[in-house]
Amino acid sequence: MLRGVLGKAFRLAGYTIQYGCIAHCAFEYVGGVVMCSGPSMEPTIQNSDIVFAENLSRHFYGIQRGDIVIAKSPSDPKSNICKRVIGLEGDKILSTSPSDVFKSRSYVPTGHVWLEGDNLQNSTDSRYYGPIPYGLIRGRIFFKIWPFSDFGFLRDSPNGQRFSDD
C-alpha cells in the first residue's frame, strides 16, 4: 500500500515538474499576457490594459522601428517598461525634451535601441537614460486583449517618425 501511494506521489511530482518546465519555456520563449501600467504609452495603451507580448521576434525576426516592446528598465532592473522602438543601431534620432523646448540629435550605437513612450510629456524613456542594450528587450507587444472595446492589433505611433536627416 505504501508503495502504491509513493508511486502515485512521485508520478504526480514528475508531471508537475514537466508541466512547469513546459509553461516556463512557453512564457520565456513564445510569449505571454502582460498588464501595462502607467501613462507613458497613452493613447495607444492605457493604464492597466492587458496585452499579448510575443518573445520570438527578439530571437528570430528582429525588432523593427515602430514596434512596442517590453524591456527591463535600465534604471530599475526589477521592473519592466513598455515603450515604442523609435531607433535601431546606427540611427540618428531627433528627440525633444518633455517640455518640447529643446531638440537634440542622438546616435544609437551598435547593439542598442532607442525607446520612447507615445505620451511624450509623461514618459521616462531613452530621452532620459539614453539608448538601451538590445539584450534588455523581453518581447514585442502587438495585440490588445483588455479592455474588450479595444480588442485587436495595436495602431501606429501618434507621434510619427522622428529621424535626423544628417
Swiss-Prot record:
Matches recorded under Pfam families: Peptidase_S26 (PF10502)
What CDD domains does the annotation carry?
Answer: S26_SPase_I
What are the annotated GO cellular component locations? mitochondrial inner membrane; mitochondrion
Which residues are named in the active-site annotation? S40, K83
**Major location (coarse):** mitochondrion
Which GO terms fall under biological process for this protein? signal peptide processing
What EC number(s) is this enzyme filed under?
3.4.21.-
Root EC class:
hydrolase
Record keywords: Hydrolase, Membrane, Mitochondrion, Mitochondrion inner membrane, Protease
Any single GO molecular-function term of the entry would be:
serine-type endopeptidase activity
Q: Where in the cell is it found?
A: Mitochondrion inner membrane
Q: Which family does it belong to?
A: Belongs to the peptidase S26 family. IMP1 subfamily.
Enumerate the PANTHER family for this protein. MITOCHONDRIAL INNER MEMBRANE PROTEASE SUBUNIT 1 (PTHR12383:SF16), PROTEASE FAMILY S26 MITOCHONDRIAL INNER MEMBRANE PROTEASE-RELATED (PTHR12383)
Q: What does this protein do?
A: Catalyzes the removal of transit peptides required for the targeting of proteins from the mitochondrial matrix, across the inner membrane, into the inter-membrane space. Known to process the nuclear encoded protein DIABLO.
Q: How does it assemble?
A: Heterodimer of 2 subunits, IMMPL1 and IMMPL2.
- The name on file for this protein is Mitochondrial inner membrane protease subunit 1
